[in-house]
Amino acid sequence: AILASLMVLSLAACGGGGGDGKGSSGDMNVAMVTDSGDITDQSFNQTTYETAKKWSEANGVTFNYYKPEKDTDEARNAAIDQAVAAGANVILLPGYMFAASLVAQTNTYPDVKFIGLDVGEGDLCEKGVGEGYTYNPADYNVGDYYNTANTYCATYQEEISGFMAGYAAVKLGYRHLGFLGGMSVPAVMRFGYGYVQGADKAAADLGCTGDVTVEYVYGGQFFGDADITAAMDTWYSSRDVEVVFACGGGIYTSAAEAAAKVGGKVIGVDSDQSSKIDTYGEKMTVTSAMKGLDATVNMILTAIKDGKWSEYAGKIDSLGMVSDEPSENFVQLPRATTQWADGLFTDADYLQLVKDIHGGKITISNDITAMPSVSITVNDYGSIK
């Protein structure tokens, strides 16, 4: 377990690399490469793209994005090659899939600054070690596998925002919940296990643990399709699931399509997905379990502009809560669009929840070796594909 208020953990801190520059935006040329999605995914890629574009325009910096031709490491590396050839010297790489690119490309381009968003120590070790990897990054020195001098990576304490989403759902009166993850990768698992813990805590607070059930499954991919929609149809229509946390980029489409048929609800992920999900049904989105991609992008680009790259180079930060003020945190719920309800769960109740987590009154486990031990019922179906 972790103390959820422990916010920023850093690994393999190294300084220098690539130089801090002149502390001016004039020399910056920013690029972003998409992973397996596109900049319209209403999730990871879109948030990174829109934030980087807005920051670059405000700071007079050249910005371009590149979409790999295929969903392969080779295609992602080729897109990075293309960005560097076009003059990029700061490259944003959103998603764990870019671990292979960081291993392959950071030594090839020592004068380019690489920012891996949602790329953790385990991801880098897995790609760096290859065959024989033990899946325990503590067995390795992660810095042996990529150029720490020109790379900054950030992961997120998804278990916290997942917890808050599950807590809110039960407090808002939902008793039959679902979790539809993309793939069973660490970030998705942290979201899911946090969601289960949050639902359990709210049920315990309300004295209704015997009445709350979570159906739990992974889709095996980060997009919706007919097979996953059919599984969601079964949940909403046959099992009377009321709300599903769709946790995996574009996989929300299958949950939303199924929910629309019966007036069901959906919880979004990564960013505030309400504007996209609500196109399937008015007020379909209960809330979204967000992580601060925008805050991270703004933070690191500003640091580079201000000549403070050495404070970030070589770090792998685990970003979570830093304040009782939700907007300052890297994990949160969207206050403007969450469906608060008087007498059940209000914005004021959310502020208290944030305070309790940040202050350590509520602790949340980030352990993903097994489903959390809880008092509510959890039905784990593995993976659809």
Where are the predicted features?
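Bacterial signal peptide processing site
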Residues: G15-G18
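Sec-dependent N-terminal signal peptides
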Residues: A1-L6
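A residue-level marker of the well-folded mature domains of exported/periplasmic proteins
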Residues: K22-K385
